[in-house]
């Protein structure tokens, strides 16, 4: 079966061009302005006039809660939410129960992801057994079982010796190591960033050095080992400065920023609405501005959502006791397009690189991130011209925990295609 996506503004090879895309048998057959030579009488047509046609977005940081907490999210609901947001490839973090920390457990997750996922789900292995021990996993074994990278996300690796051995092992087999950077000895019970706002609200604050101290340590270890070291959800200007310096000096480091750290600061916290509670916590306005600048200067390589659904019960508690995290898959592109591209802070081409091309290339997801003849037809179509209101009733995720509910944005997903199959389509009014 053939599908012709016609008259769209197509992002391809770094350029936005008015052209058509022909999909046949799950792959991209042709891209161009006149594709009639490829057509017969049996094809479907999608008129993408006034719409953006993009490579399917890539999010290397999601939490699908299955197995262990399926009341919060499942592979099916999480991947449906990803498709709703225009994502066709995601990276599933290993903070599930049981933790995928052996080749057998990783293989089980890979098979389950393939069975239940509406999008391509790349699976992380843990770095250490149970994500909290000092025993480094069998890196060669988990890679052979299908892990695309390793991470203990949700916890930082506390012992420098453990991290050094993990980096050596990951480097030996060519696995990226993605780090949740948090020195737990510096938390001091903080539930938000320490500063004027935490003192005003009377909430316990944790200093920003919680993050930057571990970034500094890990960059030294990454330089010593040569591993591909990836910093998850970077959030402070000091961390950015060190990452920028490390890149200039040959360290193989990449990093991601989240939409919420790019768009919100600790000034948004009122002490009651726990939708503003996440980890890393919202930072100072100077950090937020530094993150936005780092999107343009290349310090930040990609945007990842850290999609973290929770039940209303877990998020409805007192701010100090509520769970960390917000949902992100379904709103990320629209929020960033509205708040960064439409305001002139970021070019659309750069946003698409940050959300599709760059993460795919950094993590060697070779079939993702590009529209290319002969490659899988993983495609997202967005409406950049008509505003809509973010409404939790529209979410396909089980989690509705978002501080962005009620915001008017542009960039609604019209259609998402995975391997040539439509996995999400906007309902027309």
From Swiss-Prot:
CDD domains: DHOase_IIa. The keyword Hydrolase applies. SUPFAM superfamilies: Composite domain of metallo-dependent hydrolases, Metallo-dependent hydrolases. Zn(2+) 2 binds at residues 153, 180, 233. It is an enzyme of class 3 (hydrolase). Keywords: Hydrolase, Metal-binding, Pyrimidine biosynthesis, Zinc. Pfam families: Amidohydro_1 (PF01979). One of its GO terms (molecular function) is zinc ion binding. The active site is at 306. It catalyses: (S)-dihydroorotate + H2O = N-carbamoyl-L-aspartate + H(+). This is Dihydroorotase.
């Amino acid at each position: 079966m053939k599908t012709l996506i016609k008259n769209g503004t197509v992002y391809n090879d770094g350029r936005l061009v008015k052209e058509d895309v022909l999909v046949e048998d799950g792959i991209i057959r042709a891209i161009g302005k006149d594709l009639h030579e490829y057509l017969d009488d049996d094809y479907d047509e999608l008129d993408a006039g006034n719409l953006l046609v993009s490579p399917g977005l890539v999010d290397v940081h999601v939490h699908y809660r299955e197995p262990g907490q399926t009341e919060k999210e499942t592979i099916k609901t999480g991947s449906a939410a990803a498709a709703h947001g225009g994502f066709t490839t995601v990276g599933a973090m290993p903070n599930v129960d049981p933790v995928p920390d052996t080749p057998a457990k990783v293989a089980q997750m890979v098979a389950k992801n393939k069975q239940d996922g509406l999008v391509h789900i790349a699976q992380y292995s843990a770095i250490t057994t149970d994500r909290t021990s000092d025993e480094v996993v069998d890196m060669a074994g988990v890679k052979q079982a299908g892990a695309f990278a390793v991470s203990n996300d949700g916890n930082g690796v506390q012992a420098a010796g453990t991290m050094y051995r993990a980096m050596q092992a990951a480097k030996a087999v060519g696995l990226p190591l993605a780090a949740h950077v948090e020195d737990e000895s510096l938390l001091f019970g903080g539930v938000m960033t320490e500063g004027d706002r935490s003192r005003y609200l009377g909430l316990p604050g944790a200093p920003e050095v919680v993050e930057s101290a571990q970034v500094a340590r890990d960059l030294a270890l990454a330089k010593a080992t040569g591993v591909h070291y990836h910093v998850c959800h970077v959030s402070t200007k000091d961390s950015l400065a060190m990452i920028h310096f490390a890149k200039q000096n040959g360290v193989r480091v990449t990093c991601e920023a989240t939409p919420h750290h790019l768009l919100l600061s600790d000034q948004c916290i009122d002490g009651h609405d726990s939708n503003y509670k996440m980890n890393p916590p919202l930072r100072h306005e100077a950090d937020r501005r530094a993150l936005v600048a780092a999107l343009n200067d290349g310090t930040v390589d990609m945007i990842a959502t850290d999609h973290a659904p929770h039940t209303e019960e877990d998020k409805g508690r007192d701010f100090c006791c509520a769970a960390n995290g917000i949902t992100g898959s379904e709103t990320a592109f629209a929020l960033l397009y509205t708040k960064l591209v439409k305001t002139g802070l970021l070019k659309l081409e750069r946003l698409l690189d940050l959300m599709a091309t760059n993460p795919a290339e950094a993590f060697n997801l070779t079939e993702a991130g590009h529209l290319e003849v002969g490659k899988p037809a993983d495609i997202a179509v967005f409406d950049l011209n008509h505003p809509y209101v973010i409404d939790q009733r529209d979410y396909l995720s089980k989690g509705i925990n978002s501080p962005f509910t009620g915001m008017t944005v542009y960039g609604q997903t019209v259609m998402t295609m995975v391997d040539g199959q439509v996995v999400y389509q906007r309902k027309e009014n």
